[in-house]
């Protein structure tokens, strides 16, 4: 009775108790676990079907099995608050301050008018419905606590599913077998696991590993040999795949966090000395094997800490994740109460990409909790924290019970994934979220009497769960039909499917049908950027309205204002219809590329501009128009000068403003371009008039020597410039007198040269030089110099400079 009084979850028994067999609650939890794991195995492709199966499972359980106990009112109120807060984004935007970028969207004719805060209201409604289903399933699970013995086998079922997932993933990776429920057509599919992101798979395996620890502890103390024999290898498979097959550094880090969390909160009565000793020995053994073995996860952790050989930065330096965090905070600043709407982060984030500017638009902020705040608002985030806090606080009253190690292992497995959610998005994939939800419900539901109060509160909850079950069952059936029976897909998946249908219609020459389908879909999927592109292309290819095509393309660019690829692709589409529209689009692409490069997204604007010029050469007007954009940077001006036959280098050299902007490297490129273009006399006069340029002109001077066949002089100039050692090592007399040549290649060559065996020396060098190894090329140059063949020596030296990234000559 004292234990029950200490736990706020325990309800006093009424006088009209009816026997209620506990196996029904166990059966309800088993159904939820099976539904969640089915969703996990289908998460790589059949997303609607995966959620549909879980909803059908949860719906049937709610309809068939009345709750074993009354769920406390505070949980209902907090869940209702979370749901209500997440729906605030469906309020009119006019009720709140409107960000400037949103006002800018009103200028685009092709973009439909959206009076709500959410730019994709149908998608937001879909995700709100899924959130409601998740909360209902979670509350239902709390209403079905199970006895310790049943919890052991339900947890074992989940663990075996995790181990099976890991085993199948290992088999697929090692044999090349294609898992039938994983779509690898994404832009960067992981090479291990069947989620689209390595961290999703890692989070699943971390939860399984921690779950296994609780089961092993329970099986050992409770003398359950079968459970022990199944849990130990399952633990091994999960941990082994995490450490040596997965490349997720977060998986390794949060495995350590989860194990520590489990051990720390076990309590003194359960944290025995044998347990601690065995844990330390096991952890030390696993850590030693991990550190001495080769694995991508280990390499990525070392690089992240600045310890890897290829690491160019230390902890957090240049980390894109922190930049995305920063930009996401600006979204939260603009939408603190309502959020932007569930499911809209990827649509809104391009307007906030400053620190994290890149061509690729993140579809999440690298944090589940930040995503909740950005999409649902700060109130929803605080309510979620409050709900989690109450649940964990309430379950801690059971820490002195015999089943606490297993219960806490299940809690720790779920909490570890949630902690991982601060720096990544494991629950962003909702199919994994169902598994975490089921784990939390299994562990956080406190055990009740084996009888149920048939009070008014119980009857109300029974009715609510029955209605929710019917709704979930119907929704699950609809999702399954959408996935596998060709029904219309739900909004998050509808837009991309329509885009594919439009492409198919255009491929069949049915442009008018494609145009009609595109216009009809705009109001339903207003933020699907590909829809505007395909609509514009349909108008162009079908001899439709060029004005409509322009408007559609403008809307696509407006929805991703940082992209360089979108205006470039649009320029390509216009080339066969109206090439005059291509130049300004490519100019926009060039400007966006420059901004991305300045933000550290990707480099080599010069190479990008050069590709544009190469594509434009067959079109003189386009080629000439691109020259106007060379003023973006001196580097581009130099590329333009080298490419355009109409530019006179002498005229450019008389522009002091341009010359003053040049860095030493740009000066060198300018002189090389001038030398290659001709006008050697004017170039020589320029250098005589500007002696401060002489140092940057040395590649030109070397080329002038080569044109005069002064190879020895050119070699000497390069030798001085790069401080090269073009001599063989001096060997000790005892080495020269020995019968065995040295092992080192340069010493070996010196050995044969000193003994007058130049033929063998050249043979020793030949293999290394043919493989373009720098040392072999350097030695070939030295041997050629010794033989008096300066031209051959220069050829070898130039190859050496190219291989060492120093061969930049006209």
For the regions a protein language model found, what residue spans apply to each?
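Internal/C-terminal transmembrane anchor helices
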Residues: 274-291, 456-484
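Alpha-solenoid helical repeat scaffolds
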Residues: 499-500, 530-534, 564-570, 601-611, ...
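Alpha-helical transmembrane segments of multi-pass inner-membrane proteins
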Residues: 13, 20-45, 51-64, 83-86, ...
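Flexible juxtamembrane loops connecting transmembrane helices in multi-pass membrane enzymes
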Residues: 190-194, 258-259, 288-327, 333, ...
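Short coil turns that delineate tetratricopeptide repeat
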Residues: 492, 526-527, 561, 594-603, ...
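Alpha-helical repeat scaffolds
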Residues: 513-519, 546-557, 581-594, 618-633, ...
